[in-house]
Amino acid sequence: MLKSLFPNVDWDIVEFVGFDMDGTLYDEFNFIIQVYRPIAKRIALSTKSTEQEIYNQLLLRWMEKGSSYNKIFDEILIRHNVVESERETTINECLRIFRKHTPMLTLSDRVSFFLNYVQNKYGLFLITDGGVQLQKAKFHSLGLSSWFEEQNVGFTGLYGSEYSKPSPLITKNIKILEEVFNPKQVVFFGDREVDKKFAEVLGFQFVQTYCLQKEG
């Protein structure tokens, strides 16, 4: 199955499989539509627009730019002529809402099946960037502890920005990677260019995929 789905990987030598989380194991839009609702409500208080109008604008901009883009809230406020001092206050409150949000997420049947399959064949690990409180909440909401042991999960936000991908530093905190003697034994799945660069730095094989869709 794996050779058919991801033919660019040399599966004959793979012993360890790693994953990014957001966008790789689940559709991140499912999180965004949740967290942007209270954020839209807060931004609407600073504008003359309705909560629904702001909500739609936020979602459309996220679809255009993605989560790596950090100017979405600022752009919406500027579009609505909110003065700089109020923009700063509003953005800080929006970021607080974002970071403290309790997500309600589920894995697709496809991803659950895939994880069950590879769990029986390889050692698994996960590495995710972002604020540690929120990333842990996503991890638990998705039920990922069924496949990833705590010692093989790297929350880079726990250690500081210098540990974020593409930095290889976080791998020192992944227990199972102590067993690797050839980096080509490892394949890493991710959805972003930063995941690809991370794998390249370490010499890992890499699959760029969204929600574990087939290559090509």
Describe each model-derived feature in a short phrase.
Residues 49, 59-97:
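A metal-dependent, Asp-based hydrolase signature
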Residues 183-216:
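Acidic, Mg2+-coordinating phosphoryl-transfer loop and its flanking beta/alpha structural elements
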